[in-house]
From Swiss-Prot:
Sorted UniProt keywords: ATP-binding, Chaperone, Nucleotide-binding, Phosphoprotein, Stress response
Annotated region described as Disordered, given as residue ranges: 579-607
Biased composition (Acidic residues): 595-607
Stated name of the protein: Chaperone protein DnaK
InterPro entries in the record: ATPase_NBD, Chaperone_DnaK, Heat_shock_70_CS, HSP70_C_sf, HSP70_peptide-bd_sf, Hsp_70_fam
Chain positions found as Phosphothreonine: 173
Molecular functions (GO terms): ATP binding; ATP-dependent protein folding chaperone; unfolded protein binding
Low complexity: compositionally biased ranges: 579-591
């Protein structure tokens, strides 16, 4: 059975891991880094992902960042002269992770466990699954990020019973989950969060401050300059990271724009105290979900044994202090906040494949599910923090006499009125026999699978007619669209492989030309003109093919040159070996001729 890789598909950075034996291992990317920027660039028909894409973000307008924040929406991004769905961009990141995982493992990878924020709704989960499919991956399981982190933390502690709070502040999302660990069971008791809070928001506070200060000083608004804005974003991210280790950092952006008098530079010092002041409201927003999760789990702070920090943004000192103040506990630092989620996903892959025994994961649905009923009321069928998979049915009736059909409006959220919650989908149950209002019996059943993806069934108990849908929001992709995108992704992969092969061939040609020219020069006047002429002729032919750019011709001429150059090299080595042998023979003969010289007779006297 092929390996099931674990993928943390992050807003800012992503990571991929695999189970080796019983231990999860992070796979480094081609640049040797253990996390990969979730950045995609398009340049000259080429798709660039990761570190290389991030490096050119300042100068390349066709660069897409933080696509995860758009997952589950109908919003598209424009790049490379066309529009892409969030699923397509995410698929390019997944395809890149899959590619270097395959290189590391030396085998094809077709299956993955992908993590999502615990507070992702159904549309966002479905979009993530679709992205995996487009990338050529069978998504075996969608796992909540805090749950994956708990798996990685608790894998070697299965004999110990404890309750843990996972505080997960990533690049674009924030989750808090409370789990109970014991006897190999990872039971999620409650989860809460904010899908619009993350490291990007902390960066934005610094950007806004820099824009404001520069405008005060120079009267120019940098927020309208796209290239300047990207430089500000890079500087803000760097300053934020610096301030996790030092109390003050210098921001220097020469030639940020031009004024009437010439070029202008941005120079400022940002202290940690100022940064804390700018981001105080963001840190404050992390407190409510912590309290909500504890309340939903029916626990008090004294019941929590460990607090685990996950996500790069938990390195911000003010965030760490807020966690300490809110929980009264020193956070556990035994896990790497950037890597632990991917490692947990790899462990879940091992559970699915049977490589990890005696581990059971019980996750929950983060938001309540229900339908709209008379008066625009949201009637919940499944409460938030219900363990999944689960199923729940409830019987409803018609609101009017002789009503021939009922509209089922499926929603997700916590507000009492339907209009204030997230619409997951709508469908209709028709051909209801004429009857007074309140008489027909319509049974509505909600099913949530292990990935947190919802399907809904409505059944007329009188006629036994039923209608079932797997929820597809207005951002969902049809099977045909996914199929087309999969083909596009495969074509891109083939084009990338072809481009790589072309570069390798051109490098081989350059190397062969250099080596052969060197050999021809070294063999000048050494007496094997036939082989030299043949190599020179093959060399000239290869140079012509190189100029024409015909790859097939280059390949054929390269093979021909290698053959002739090898024959010439053999002659050269044979000559060198013969000369060495002759020299060794001459030295041996000389030693024999001189063997009688300088011999002195001596007497030996025994005492």
């Amino acid at each position: 059975m092929s390996k099931i890789i674990g993928i943390d598909l992050g807003t800012t950075n992503s990571a991929v891991a695999v189970l080796e034996g019983t231990e999860p291992k992070i796979i480094a990317n081609p640049e040797g880094n253990r996390t990969t920027p979730s950045v995609v660039s398009f340049k000259n028909g080429e798709i660039i992902v990761g570190d290389a894409a991030k490096r050119q973000a300042v100068t390349n307008p066709d660069t897409v960042i933080s696509i995860k924040s758009k997952m589950g929406t109908s919003e598209k991004v424009s790049a490379n002269g066309k529009e892409y769905t969030p699923q397509e961009i995410s698929a390019l990141i997944l395809q890149y992770l899959k590619g270097y995982a395959e290189e590391y493992l030396g085998e094809k990878v077709t299956k993955a466990v992908i993590t999502v924020p615990a507070y992702f709704n159904d549309a966002q989960r479905q979009a993530t699954k679709d992205a995996g499919k487009i990338a050529g991956l069978e998504v075996e399981r969608i796992v909540n990020e805090p749950t994956a982190a708990a798996l990685a933390y608790g894998l070697d502690k299965t004999d110990k019973e404890e309750k843990i709070l996972v505080f997960d502040l990533g690049g674009g999302t924030f989750d808090v989950s409370i789990l109970e660990l014991g006897d190999g069971v990872f039971d999620v008791l409650a989860t809460a969060g904010d899908n619009k809070l993350g490291g990007d928001d902390f960066d934005q506070k610094i950007i806004d401050y820099m824009v404001e200060e520069f405008k005060k000083e120079n009267g120019i608004d940098l927020s309208t300059d796209k290239m300047a804005l990207q430089r500000l974003k890079d500087a803000a991210e760097k300053a934020k990271k610096d301030l996790s280790g030092v109390t003050s950092t210098q921001i220097s952006l020469p030639f940020i724009t031009a004024g009437e008098a010439g070029p202008l530079h941005l120079e400022m010092t940002l202290t940690r105290a100022k940064f804390d002041d700018l981001t105080r409201d963001l840190v404050e927003r992390t407190k409510t979900p912590v309290r909500q999760a504890l309340s939903d789990a029916g626990l008090s702070l004294s019941d929590i044994d460990e607090v685990i920090l996950v996500g790069g943004s938990t390195r911000i000192p003010a965030v760490v202090e807020a966690v300490k103040a809110e929980t009264g506990k020193e956070p556990n630092k035994s896990v790497n906040p950037d890597e632990v989620v991917a490692m947990g996903a790899a462990i879940q892959g091992g559970v699915i494949s049977g490589d990890v025994k005696d581990v059971v994961l019980l996750d929950v649905t983060p938001l309540s599910l229900g339908i709209e009923t008379m008066g625009g009321v949201f009637t919940k069928l499944i409460e938030r923090n219900t363990t999944i998979p689960t199923s729940k049915s409830q019987v409803f009736s018609t609101a009017a006499d002789n009503q021939p059909a009922v509209d089922i409006h499926v929603l997700q959220g916590e507000r009492p009125m339907a209009a204030d919650n997230k619409t997951l989908g709508r469908f209709q149950l028709t051909d209801i026999p004429a009857a007074p209002r309140g008489v027909p019996q319509i049974e509505v059943t909600f099913d949530i699978d292990k990935n947190g993806i919802v399907s809904v069934k409505a059944k007329d108990l009188g006629t036994q007619k039923e209608q079932t849908i797997v929820i597809q929001s207005n951002s969902g992709l049809t099977d045909e669209e996914i199929e087309r995108m999969m083909k596009d992704a495969e074509a891109n992969a083939e084009a990338d492989a072809k481009r790589k092969a072309e570069v390798e061939l051109r490098n081989e040609v350059d190397q062969a030309i250099f080596a052969t020219e060197k050999t021809i020069k070294e063999t000048e006047g050494k007496g094997f003109d036939t082989e030299r002429d043949a190599a020179q002729s093959a060399l000239d032919e290869l140079k012509k093919a190189q100029e024409s750019g015909n790859l097939d011709d280059m390949k054929a001429k390269l093979e021909a040159l290698n053959e002739k150059a090898q024959a010439l090299a053999v002659k050269l080595y044979e000559q060198a070996a013969a000369a060495q042998q002759a020299q060794a023979g001459a030295e041996g003969a000389q030693a024999t001729d001189n063997s009688g010289d300088d011999v002195v007779d001596g007497e030996f006297t025994e005492k």
